[in-house]
């Protein structure tokens, strides 16, 4: 299943609607439909605006947003003259199609209304703007304790804290710290938890804090507890006495079982993927295609580069699947595309980063179709050779990512798609390249084409722990996602993209967060005129 990134709210307005009513203006309503398995399904509607040819609808349209899929939308405008919910007996004033990705990456998108393909609805236009529905605030705290009671017979306590919020007459666990072993004066790691989860968004919601001694069998011993609110926690430095109720009742001389000290407590904004995209961050998409000899002679039907009578192969299918999603987030739709592992004319030297269009000074292709065309034209002009070296292309994209990072703004993020038929040859150099790239605003997606052994690729994916170079340097973050194409060859085409792109939003946000870069503080983008509107 696709992973829902967030909920998006769409605001809709129209201009210059055609009039279908005699003696008055139309009474328009907007219907939102989504392509579900090739059929249009209605999601929601706005209210009807009476007697208006340029309505601004007050009711917003809500839709779940998924980065890793192309969500095709259709907006239909109808003149409502009766009380029935069916639209078949209402006049159609025009419609427009686009993807949700186009809307969120444009912030505001204006499209011409069409009565049918090729027939405009007069001068009518529809303008759609997107807003993310969320409370992005998080509570970030640093907490320590002093002079906690000793609970273990043969050693000191192993303390941890639990924070509970009150709701519906119950206490709900909001956060649990790590355990600090054998320490009566522990300092816990700084932590962040969403404001909504911590206190329901209310700074005065009662909070209970429990300090306990960890036992491996689960029978944790209470050290002490106290009650507070987030408002009180923010009054740093704040100290709270841990009180053990039974000890307090038994001993008149009892004071406390230690104190908990809040060193820092801040409510901060935690930016989301859409915050960055709608703030103007461009996702730069680059493609690298494997032209090594192990693919087989392209003229042979057994070759992975063989173009079927329909003009496709596994390489192109994977490219279309991933590229069709990413292209919506790049405003100029110009994508650099490279090949590697081939002997290239005119001197027939092996190259591991040659431009597919054979123009090294301008390797950009116009849209995904442009990459496909360049690939088809390059295929008969090169000699498949080897070895399979990834490092040159990774380093190539990393140089551009490093230049972007020097701006110290969340303006650009780079996604490299590598399509390959076999295990990487330059393992050490590739590991080093990935580790260096992990410090930059970029992600690497590797799709394994064919039936080779891709064990080394799984190591690059590093799901079991951080990737390390031979010298022991660890990747700053996980930026590689690998999948074998044949796992998805019998699944719908969008399934591959859903799998390989699902981690990109998290990877992008984690990088910008680590750098401390907020989304670009740009003014809302001006509405695109109909002539500029992206074509779907």
From Swiss-Prot:
Disulfide bonds: none annotated. Ca(2+) 2 binds at residues 21, 79, 81, 91. Ca(2+) 3 binds at residues 152, 158, 213, 215. PROSITE patterns: C2. Ca(2+) 4 binds at residues 152, 213, 215, 221. GO terms for molecular function: calcium ion binding; calcium-dependent phospholipid binding; endopeptidase activity; identical protein binding; NF-kappaB binding; phosphatidylserine binding. It comes from the Eukaryota. C2 domains are necessary for calcium-dependent cell membrane association. C2 domains are necessary for neuronal progenitor cell differentiation in a calcium-independent manner. Calcium-dependent phospholipid-binding protein that plays a role in calcium-mediated intracellular processes. Involved in the TNF-alpha receptor signaling pathway in a calcium-dependent manner. Exhibits calcium-dependent phospholipid binding properties. Plays a role in neuronal progenitor cell differentiation; induces neurite outgrowth via a AKT-dependent signaling cascade and calcium-independent manner. May recruit target proteins to the cell membrane in a calcium-dependent manner. May function in membrane trafficking. This is Copine-1. The gene is Cpne1.
């Amino acid at each position: 299943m696709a992973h829902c990134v967030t909920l998006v709210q769409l605001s809709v307005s129209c201009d210059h609607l055609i009039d279908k009513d005699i003696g008055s203006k139309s009474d328009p309503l907007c219907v939102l439909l989504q392509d579900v398995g090739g059929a249009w399904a209605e999601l929601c509607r706005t209210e009807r605006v009476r007697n208006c040819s340029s309505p601004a609808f007050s009711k917003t349209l809500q839709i779940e947003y998924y980065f890793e899929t192309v969500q095709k939308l259709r907006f239909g405008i109808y003149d409502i003259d009766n009380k029935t919910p069916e639209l078949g007996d209402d006049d159609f004033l025009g419609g427009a199609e686009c993807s949700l990705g186009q809307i969120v990456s444009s912030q505001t998108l204006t499209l011409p209304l069409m009565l049918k393909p090729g027939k405009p609805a007069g001068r009518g236009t529809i303008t759609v703007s997107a807003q993310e529905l969320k409370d992005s605030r998080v509570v970030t705290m640093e907490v320590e304790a002093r002079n906690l009671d000793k609970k273990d017979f043969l050693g000191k306590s192993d303390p941890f804290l639990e924070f509970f919020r009150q709701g519906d007459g119950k206490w709900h666990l909001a956060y649990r710290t790590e355990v600090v072993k054998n320490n009566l004066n522990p300092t816990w790691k700084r932590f962040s938890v969403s404001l909504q989860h911590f206190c329901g968004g209310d700074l005065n919601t009662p909070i209970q804090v429990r300090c306990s001694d960890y036992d491996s069998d689960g029978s944790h011993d209470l050290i002490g507890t106290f009650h507070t609110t987030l408002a009180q926690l923010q009054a740093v430095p704040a100290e709270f006495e841990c009180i053990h109720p039974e000890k307090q009742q038994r001993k008149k001389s009892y004071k406390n079982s230690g104190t908990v000290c809040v060193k820092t407590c801040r409510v901060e904004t935690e930016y989301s993927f859409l915050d960055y995209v709608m703030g103007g961050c461009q996702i730069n998409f680059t493609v690298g295609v494997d032209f090594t000899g192990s693919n087989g002679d392209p003229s042979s039907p057994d070759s992975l580069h063989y173009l079927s009578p329909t003009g496709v192969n596994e390489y192109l299918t994977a490219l279309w699947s991933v590229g069709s999603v990413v292209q919506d987030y790049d405003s100029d739709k110009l994508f650099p595309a490279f090949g590697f592992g081939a002997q290239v004319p005119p001197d027939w030297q092996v190259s591991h980063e040659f431009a597919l269009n054979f123009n090294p000074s301008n390797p950009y292709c116009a849209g995904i179709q442009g990459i496909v065309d360049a690939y088809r034209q390059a295929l008969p002009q090169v000699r498949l050779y080897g070895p399979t070296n990834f490092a040159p292309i990774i380093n190539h994209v990393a140089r551009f990512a490093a230049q972007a990072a020097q701006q110290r703004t969340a303006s650009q993020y780079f996604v490299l798609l590598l399509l390959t038929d076999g295990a990487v040859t330059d393992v050490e150099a590739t590991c080093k390249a990935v580790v260096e790239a992990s410090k930059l605003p970029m992600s690497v997606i590797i799709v394994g084409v064919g039936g080779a052994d891709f064990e080394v690729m799984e190591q690059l994916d590093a799901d079991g722990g951080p990737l390390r170079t031979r010298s022991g340097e660890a990747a700053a973050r996980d930026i590689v996602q690998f999948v074998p194409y044949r796992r998805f060859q019998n699944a719908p085409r969008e399934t591959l993209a859903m799998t390989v792109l699902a981690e990109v939003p998290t990877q992008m946000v984690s990088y910008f967060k680590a750098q401390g870069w907020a989304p670009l503080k740009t003014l809302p983008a001006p509405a695109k005129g109909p002539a500029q509107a992206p074509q779907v």
